[in-house]
Amino acid sequence: MAIRPLHDRVIIKREEVETLSAGGIVLTGSAATKSTRAKVLAVGKGRVLENGTVQPLDVKVGDTVIFNDGYGVKAEKIDGEEVLIISENDILAIVE
């Protein structure tokens, strides 16, 4: 299934988190935190400004980003995989 985000929305897939501690202990449950790094899968056309022009997004498909995992993050299952739909405002940085 193809999915295309609207406006300033971005679809990302969370990166896997290392489940071993520095001492070699396997972390499970609440001890294993979710990653806030993700790969950008799709981007909308941009934010519509008050004057009607569209401001393109700074992120592009394939970028690795660090995002704010909180209110406004929508999780969805697409073809059996969990993806997140977020606003570009929730992206804190692009990893280069």
Curated annotation (Swiss-Prot):
* Organism domain of life: Bacteria
Please give the SUPFAM superfamilies that the UniProt record associates with this protein: GroES-like (SSF50129)
Which biological process terms from the Gene Ontology are attached to this UniProt entry? chaperone cofactor-dependent protein refolding
Keywords linked to the UniProt accession: Chaperone, Cytoplasm
- A Gene Ontology MF term for this entry? metal ion binding
Q: Where is the signal peptide?
A: none
Pfam families in the cross-refs: Cpn10 (PF00166)
UniProt-listed CDD domains = cpn10
- Does Oxidoreductase appear among the keywords? no
- Cellular component annotations (GO), alphabetically ordered: cytoplasm
Read off the InterPro entries from this record: Chaperonin_GroES (IPR020818), Chaperonin_GroES_sf (IPR037124), Chaprnonin_Cpn10_CS (IPR018369), GroES-like_sf (IPR011032)
Cellular localisation = Cytoplasm
- Quote the subunit structure annotation: Heptamer of 7 subunits arranged in a ring. Interacts with the chaperonin GroEL.
Write out the function statement from the record: Together with the chaperonin GroEL, plays an essential role in assisting protein folding. The GroEL-GroES system forms a nano-cage that allows encapsulation of the non-native substrate proteins and provides a physical environment optimized to promote and accelerate protein folding. GroES binds to the apical surface of the GroEL ring, thereby capping the opening of the GroEL channel.
Similarity remark? Belongs to the GroES chaperonin family.
> What protein name does the entry list?
Co-chaperonin GroES
